């Protein structure tokens, strides 16, 4: 065998092998590689999308927490304002009640003083009549007595 023939035969066998690989093996292999590349690309896109969604979710969580804090602070401020209103209303009510009780006590004191004065006047008038009676050694009639007492009470 001649070396040229061997090289020629090997070249034909190699060309046949290249043709078989290029027509029968290479297209399905390329197809599988492309499918794998597409799956990897889809996976990377899904991962990117997941990262974006995660970032959006975290932003929404931050906004929600911020809103919740603001709402809580607002509720606390309203509660403090309401407590202040209740305290002020209670103070005003206590002052009103104190004034009312003071007025009632003042009226009661004045009424008691008036009763005591009237009683004292009656007692003084009786003592005065008894003293005058003893001095004059005679009795004064009731009408004259009443008239004198009324004049005396008016002067007092």
Curated annotation (Swiss-Prot):
UniProt cross-references to SUPFAM superfamilies, sorted A to Z: F1F0 ATP synthase subunit B, membrane domain (SSF81573)
Superkingdom field: Bacteria
InterPro entries: ATP_synth_B-like_membr_sf (IPR028987), ATP_synth_b/b'su_bac/chlpt (IPR002146), ATP_synth_F0_bsu_bac (IPR005864), ATP_synthase_B_chain (IPR050059)
Annotated compartments: Cell inner membrane
A cellular component term, taken from the record's GO annotations: proton-transporting ATP synthase complex
Record's bilayer topology term: Single-pass membrane protein
GO function terms (MF aspect): proton-transporting ATP synthase activity, rotational mechanism; proton-transporting ATPase activity, rotational mechanism
TM region(s), chain numbering: 3-23
Keywords: ATP synthesis, Cell inner membrane, Cell membrane, CF(0), Hydrogen ion transport, Ion transport, Membrane, Transmembrane, Transmembrane helix, Transport
Short name of one Pfam family: ATP-synt_B
Role played: F(1)F(0) ATP synthase produces ATP from ADP in the presence of a proton or sodium gradient. F-type ATPases consist of two structural domains, F(1) containing the extramembraneous catalytic core and F(0) containing the membrane proton channel, linked together by a central stalk and a peripheral stalk. During catalysis, ATP synthesis in the catalytic domain of F(1) is coupled via a rotary mechanism of the central stalk subunits to proton translocation. Component of the F(0) channel, it forms part of the peripheral stalk, linking F(1) to F(0).
Full protein name: ATP synthase subunit b
Organism listed in the record: Xylella fastidiosa (strain M12)
Gene name of the encoded protein: atpF
């Amino acid at each position: 065998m001649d070396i040229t023939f061997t090289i020629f035969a090997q070249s034909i066998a190699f060309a046949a092998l290249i043709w078989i690989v290029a027509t029968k093996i290479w297209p399905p292999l390329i197809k599988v590689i492309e499918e794998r590349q597409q799956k990897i690309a889809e996976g990377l896109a899904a991962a990117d999308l997941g990262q974006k969604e995660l970032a959006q979710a975290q932003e929404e969580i931050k906004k929600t927490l911020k809103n919740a804090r603001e709402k809580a602070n607002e509720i606390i401020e309203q509660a403090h304002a309401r407590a202040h209103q209740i305290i002020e209303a209670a103070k005003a009510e206590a002052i009103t009640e104190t004034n009312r009780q003071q007025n009632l006590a003042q009226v009661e004191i004045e009424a008691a003083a008036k009763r005591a004065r009237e009683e004292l006047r009656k007692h003084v008038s009786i003592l005065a009549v008894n003293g005058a009676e003893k001095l004059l050694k005679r009795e004064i009639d009731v009408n004259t007595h009443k008239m004198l007492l009324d004049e005396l009470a008016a002067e007092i």
